[in-house]
């Protein structure tokens, strides 16, 4: 940074100081946009507050001197104004607040005990006064399952947010940590709830079953955590179950999830005799006493029969840490033993850097060893200041900008979830930078509209606690803000936007209509609400049949919405047979030369397009989206007409010629053509391209693609033959089988079309003891006979409509 820029920055800083003192909006806006080597004068402002003092309350000469000193340091050392440097120099109160904040999610395979574990967390932190179980066995149900359907079915359908304070003993005294927690669904049909939770969280607890270990949805959750770079600790639950084998689960984390993992604990007993754990770092035995395990008892007396195992597992922990942390590696190579503090610091570093996951174990249902998991959340998961969160600066071609969890900086937040409540739309927001205050005006980066925040609440499942302000790094909900999921909000001075969450495409559809016309209004309200709340739930009206079509992630997903419509809106509906989301593609290169020519007196239509269609070779992730390219030379087609050609191509790909389903893996090139001085128009070229596409597509040996689902089935070993028979009837491809002492797990790619009704057949084949889960894997060519039937049925339906 040149000294000229430093001088300009100091001047900007001084101007900003006056603006902040006088709260002049225009001056403040200019201040935020002052150029200081791409960092903006706002960092200079912050720099002038370093060292825990608000230097803007001092004289102008001192203020400018402090700013100049900071900026001169930045000129010599660019790292002086990095996020880390700012965090290191926050005032003591702000630094201490951030250090004690944890934003975490609990995620796992279905029925691994997420909600049960969350219930214990809330009880042990004093957030609830009594423990209630999943499925509403005591007519109350778990706190985080607030929907009636969740309590009936015993599954989590919507992610639920809460907050609590955990008193952790550090250096002989209690330290209070503030935990924002989101409990997520385990069923793949509700995967969007996991996606949007992990998008805004700083860390996670991945729960595994001590018997089943890594399961299909565990692998999906692992993939989602990697997508958003979320550090995790692992908690092996259900240690009291018959067949519990925690070290097998640790081995599966290493092998199947391919992330280095090591146990921090050894169980004291197992199955019915599970009684506590040995902490391998401090080498202490930990027991839970009291009616609900609320009293923690620690002792130096490790059971004699476990001493050798504990020594082996502690050595393995140190060896694993040496592979992922340089400091422990040096100690290990010097054949020394790391101290407790060195081990904990190394686990924290490696976990936050996504190089390692520490593994704890316990039984939430038996009220054992949940508190040590809470200690691990505080010890090993990051606080908001330790996570890199990026925004995109619209002024600089969407260059990434680091956000800093500091209350004094301009506000930046992300709306990640919407819910309808009795008081209107409830919008969940993660505050990444600055603070959000009641009555504050914020700007939606997508719509460029200003909105006022009338009310801020903290959520405790379905209960609300109103607050006047939320600080940086926190999660809250607001009322009265019209927005979409994934919208970025700022204070108006920063042209920032943030990337949204990944939204998978639906794989199943069905037609739906109210049974009576008088329910039409409520039916429309329900459709609009469900679409706003859930990005994976799609609604459209078929242009030809005029039927309302809903699409989602699976049968259960759509069944839940149909049931919610009946319960929440009192609308009885009729649904059609579920329809698979097929795709279409070509397999051969086809050249086209098509002319559209219409003359009806006066101005006519004329457009000639020349080029070719060709298949895009499927990659490791399957069929790619269809693409368009123009290679016209000599100006035979003008740019505006080429743009119309592309629009025609994209419109054609939305509704393919074979079945009316979207087109994948097809590349169109327009390399020549002709225009007419008066008869050519954008509409003519769009129509000509669509006609050329349809004709060429049918000449390119087209195929129907069907979705294949990665299906995981678990059942007792005696039913293995029955299940293999069921899959063979469906032409499934078995990719993996794992046989345990009692149960086996089978993984196969199955056609979604063949899986309708599989649930009832599986129950019959396993006497109700089998379970299965599906998630979308990839598209593949459908069997030839099925393709013929589908095309024939589609053509017949089209002909019938034209007759009408």
Curated annotation (Swiss-Prot):
Protein name: Elongation factor G, mitochondrial
SUPFAM superfamilies named among the record's database cross-references: EF-G C-terminal domain-like, P-loop containing nucleoside triphosphate hydrolases, Ribosomal protein S5 domain 2-like, Translation proteins
Lineage of origin: Eukaryota, Fungi, Dikarya, Ascomycota, Pezizomycotina
Molecular-function GO terms, alphabetical: GTP binding; GTPase activity; translation elongation factor activity
Pathway in which this enzyme or protein is active: Protein biosynthesis; polypeptide chain elongation
InterPro entries: EFG_II (IPR041095), EFG_III (IPR009022), EFG_III/V (IPR035647), EFG_IV (IPR047872), EFG_V (IPR035649), EFG_V-like (IPR000640), EFTu-like_2 (IPR004161), G_TR_CS (IPR031157)
Family indicated by similarity: Belongs to the TRAFAC class translation factor GTPase superfamily. Classic translation factor GTPase family. EF-G/EF-2 subfamily.
Keywords: Elongation factor, GTP-binding, Mitochondrion, Nucleotide-binding, Protein biosynthesis, Transit peptide
Protein residues bound to GTP: 108-115, 183-187, 237-240
One Gene Ontology CC term in the entry: mitochondrion
Limits of the tr-type G domain: 99-385
Role: Mitochondrial GTPase that catalyzes the GTP-dependent ribosomal translocation step during translation elongation. During this step, the ribosome changes from the pre-translocational (PRE) to the post-translocational (POST) state as the newly formed A-site-bound peptidyl-tRNA and P-site-bound deacylated tRNA move to the P and E sites, respectively. Catalyzes the coordinated movement of the two tRNA molecules, the mRNA and conformational changes in the ribosome.
Transit peptide: 1-63
An annotated GO BP: mitochondrial translational elongation
Compartmental location: Mitochondrion
Highest rank taxon of the organism: Eukaryota
